[in-house]
Amino acid sequence: MFDVLVYLYETYYRPDACPDSEALVKKLSAVGFEEEEITKALGWLTALAETTNELSDSYPHQTAFSFGTRIYVSQETDVLGTPAVGFIQFLEAAKLINPIQREIVIERALAAGETPISLEKLKVIVLMVLWSQGKEPDGLIFDELFLDDDDAAPRILH
């Protein structure tokens, strides 16, 4: 599923640039993706759109729960794991995602069906949440999303 999501991100600038579902399925099949992978990815994206619409309608000013500390329930920490929770907190503290986007990322990570979800896959989820909203990640988030730990320059701690 994640390979299909990355392919869609790399191929289509915005979600509305994607062809209709039938044509998209044919194109994804033609480039070598399995039907099960395609179905799972497109279902995941449909649920992403539904979650985004629900939260946007419920919190139109995107200020809900923005001043509190997010407490994760055990089901969330089991699925996300400590590195993913830390990464989400980093993104929010750096104002690279807002509280509504954070909740969408968490919901979509829980729906991915992996326990714990890898940091690499969480980064794809963050990217897809931003992509689905037509948001272009700034340079800092782009580096964080695409640099592997092996590729990153060592960080100097003071």
From Swiss-Prot:
InterPro entries cross-referenced by the UniProt entry: Smg
Residue ranges of the TM segments: none
Highest taxon listed in the record's lineage: Bacteria
Family per record: Belongs to the Smg family.
Protein name as annotated: Protein Smg homolog
Originating species: Herminiimonas arsenicoxydans
Gene: smg
